[in-house]
Amino acid sequence: KRLLEKSSNGHITGVDYSEVSVQKSKKLNRAAIQEGRCEVLQGNVMNLPFSENSFHLVTAFETIYFWPGIQVAFQQVYRVLKNGGTFLICNESNGKNTKDEKWTDIIHGMTIYTSEQIEKALKNAGFSKIQVEQNEKGWLCAICKRDN
């Protein structure tokens, strides 16, 4: 919804693995969907249901923890980004706080990646201009480009 507010002339496509999340997002964004400004799909980041060079921007907020393999997932994001497109990742955990371990202990399949792991996987997927920032609370934000 916030991306729609910031992109009054754009089209937003949302993808989530969870059917429950897809239905909630469709309900929240009903007006924009009816206007043709938004679509929400169920999908898997390991095999994104889009053609190459489809998007100017791909975001991942609090989600890469649950991707089965970030290397393959980042390659999929790279594939669907247009040349010059941006990939933005925001995580509340940076993998360096001992408190992070409690989450991986109670949430099956969750992996908290360090900035170094994310940067390496982005580079291996072909991304350039990679910037990774962290704050004092442990939040991590990575931004990079597809340039080719």
Where are the regions a protein language model picked out?
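A short acidic, Gly/Pro-enriched loop at the edge of an enzyme's catalytic core
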Residues: 46-58
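A short SAM/SAH-binding and catalytic strip from SAM-dependent methyltransferases
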Residues: 56-70
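C-terminal alpha-helical "lid/dimerization" subdomain adjacent to the S-adenosyl-L-methionine
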Residues: 75, 85-143
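C-terminal beta-strand of the catalytic ATP-binding
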Residues: 144-148
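Short alpha-helical
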Residues: 19-20, 65, 139
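Class I SAM-dependent methyltransferase SAM/SAH-binding core
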Residues: 1-47
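Surface-exposed loop/turn positions
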Residues: 10, 52-54, 84-85
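A short glycine-rich, Lys/Arg-flanked "PGG" loop and its adjoining helix->strand segment in the class I
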Residues: 71-83
